[in-house]
Swiss-Prot record:
pH-activity relationship: Optimum pH is 7.2.
Organism of this sequence: Mycobacterium tuberculosis (strain ATCC 25618 / H37Rv)
UniProt xrefs under InterPro entries: Urease_gamma, Urease_gamma/gamma-beta_su, Urease_gamma_sf, Urease_subunit
HAMAP family per the UniProt record, alphabetical: Urease_gamma
Alphabetized Gene3D superfamilies for the sequence: Urease, gamma-like subunit (3.30.280.10)
Pfam families: Urease_gamma
Alphabetical keyword list: Cytoplasm, Hydrolase
Location of the protein in the cell: Cytoplasm
A GO cellular component annotation in the UniProt record: cytoplasm
Its EC number(s): 3.5.1.5
Gene name of the encoded protein: ureA
The name this protein goes by in its record: Urease subunit gamma
Family note: Belongs to the urease gamma subunit family.
Listed GO biological process terms: urea catabolic process
Pathway field: Nitrogen metabolism; urea degradation; CO(2) and NH(3) from urea (urease route): step 1/1
Length: 100
C-alpha cells in the first residue's frame, strides 16, 4: 500500500485519536496532543460524512469537556484548525475554545 505524505498524516492522526478514545474509555484524562487528535478526527470524519463547516465548528466544541482532559489543557487550546476535504473542496475549519 502506497500512501502520500498527506494520507500518512491523516492515518497517524486517526490512530492517535483512536488511542486517545481508548484511554478516555478507561477513565484517563487526555493530554494536549490527545485532545487535539480527538477534535481534529471529529472534524475530518464529519467532513467526510458531508457535514458543513458551520456544523463542525459548533460540534467541535462539544467533543470534549473539562472533565475529559488534564488540568491546564483547556487553557492551552485556544483553537484547533484542521484542513478538511468536503464534497465541494478543501476548507480550513477553525474551532475556537474547543474545550468548554
Amino acid at each position: 500500500m502506497r500512501l502520500t505524505p498527506h494520507e500518512q498524516e491523516r492515518l497517524l492522526l486517526s490512530y492517535a485519536a483512536e488511542l486517545a478514545r481508548r484511554r478516555r474509555a478507561r477513565g484517563l484524562r487526555l493530554n494536549h496532543p490527545e485532545a487535539i487528535a480527538v477534535i481534529a478526527d471529529h472534524i475530518l470524519e464529519g467532513a467526510r460524512d458531508g457535514r458543513t463547516v458551520a456544523e463542525l465548528m459548533a460540534s467541535g466544541r462539544e467533543v470534549l469537556g473539562r472533565d475529559d482532559v488534564m488540568e491546564g489543557v483547556p487553557e492551552m487550546l485556544a483553537e484547533v484548525q484542521v484542513e478538511a476535504t468536503f464534497p465541494d473542496g478543501t476548507k480550513l475549519v477553525t474551532v475556537h475554545q474547543p474545550i468548554a
